[in-house]
């Protein structure tokens, strides 16, 4: 049985080819034809401060369970698919624990993981160590790759990633800032986590590209997530006459910073934050503080794509979510759905 499981794991990565900038996985036919079915593990934050990232996951998994009810075609044969979902609780330690449970206890054949390096990285590391193929998303590729001590000359053997990079978000932020008259002085809010360390990195993050475009970046240093006092950062920004604030913070920290900035009389012309402002609920929680803020948009109902699984357009997928949940669409819907598109496409293109 262990031999069969290893064969199935190894099979999943043998015929890799690029899909949307990420390596897709290939699976030999005979391994699954003889198997009782495929187990897919899915890890994301359902609770804790990162929970908004996982808000749409139950909806997407319900869609997939319905779609997979009769199995999927692999080489003309129907193969049963089971999805086992786990909550990272917004904790890197917990993410690693549930990944190991899925690998060692549930015996999953393929792992899918989404939402921030604090989730994707420990799950990917567990899969790399245990030789389980893994596809991850919703974390810029730099903190996922270099945050795991990746070597560009070697890459990884079992773990694959689909998402944009810091070069993309920096270019978009800069384009927006150039449209507003400012003194080009930028204050950075970079926490001591995978995203913050990558975004603030002098070689791979914001400092270099901003300097090349004539912007100066003041980085007052790292802080812990769930910070309750941003007085030091606000004082530094005021002293340096900062007119643009950027960074990558969790929703609770954005609210704390914006509240304290208002209380302390700091009024930047532009506030562009990654991560914290992606979700309708997070903006609603800010009240009037949410007016005039900006952030990146990496999926929306207006994106011109159609699902390879359900044939829904992005607009139809968003409408389906809103109808089922009575909540406004949220960006991670598209990438949670895309994880399953890549997984199924790879499985359907298997070879003996």
Where are these regions (language model features)?
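Extracytoplasmic "Venus flytrap"
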Residues: 41-64, 86-92, 115-116, 189-201, ...
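C-terminal segment of N-terminal export signals and the immediately downstream linker at the start
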Residues: 4, 27-45
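Extracytoplasmic ligand/sensor domains, especially the bilobed periplasmic-binding protein
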Residues: 108-221, 271-295
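Stable alpha-helical elements in mature extracytoplasmic
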Residues: 49, 53-60, 64, 95-99, ...
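N-terminal secretory signal peptides and thylakoid transit peptides that target proteins
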Residues: 1-20, 27
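Extracellular/periplasmic periplasmic-binding protein-like sensory domains
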Residues: 141, 261-337, 349-350
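Extracellular/periplasmic bilobal clamshell ligand-binding domains
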Residues: 230, 241, 341-352
